[in-house]
């Protein structure tokens, strides 16, 4: 039997102002077998002076955030940073927070590939 996978949009492409953060839509995996969560950060022509960070959380209930993985982007003008986090099958709820650096806006987006049946 073939596996069933579902694409999810957690955060549509949007500008994130300097020194601000955004939370992606929570991903409910309580009836799924895990997921890959991908975040894309694009710096503008004026790069941030402090690297933006992406934090992936898992939790046993909706809204619970227990840090699974954190990664930082770069401070290079016009660069694109893609980060992928493998959410294991025991993960029930997934949250992603993107924190921008101190100067200049960036563009952010987040997607997931959910394994729904095996």
Question: What are these regions, as identified by a protein language model?
Answer:
Residues 33-39, 87-106:
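Noncatalytic modules at the cell exterior or secretory-pathway interfaces
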Residues 7-12, 62-71:
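Surface-exposed loop/edge segments in extracytoplasmic proteins
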Residues 11-31, 42-55, 61, 75-82, ...:
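Surface-exposed ligand/attachment interfaces on beta-rich extracellular proteins
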Residues 1-16, 114-118:
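Short, intrinsically disordered N-terminal pre-domain segments
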Residues 103-118:
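C-terminal edge strands of extracellular/lumenal beta-sandwich accessory domains
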Residues 67-69, 79-86:
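Mid-chain, well-packed structural core segment of small domains
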């Amino acid at each position: 039997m073939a596996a069933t996978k579902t694409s999810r949009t957690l955060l549509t492409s949007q500008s994130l102002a300097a020194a601000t953060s955004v939370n992606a839509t929570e991903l409910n995996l309580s009836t799924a077998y895990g997921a890959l969560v991908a975040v894309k950060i694009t710096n503008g022509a004026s790069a941030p002076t402090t690297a933006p960070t992406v934090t992936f959380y898992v939790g046993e209930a909706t809204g619970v955030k227990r840090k699974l993985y954190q990664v930082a982007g770069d401070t290079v003008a016009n660069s694109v940073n893609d980060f992928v986090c493998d959410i294991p099958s025991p993960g029930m709820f997934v949250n992603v927070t993107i924190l921008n650096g101190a100067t200049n806006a960036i563009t952010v987006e987040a997607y997931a590939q959910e394994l729904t049946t095996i």
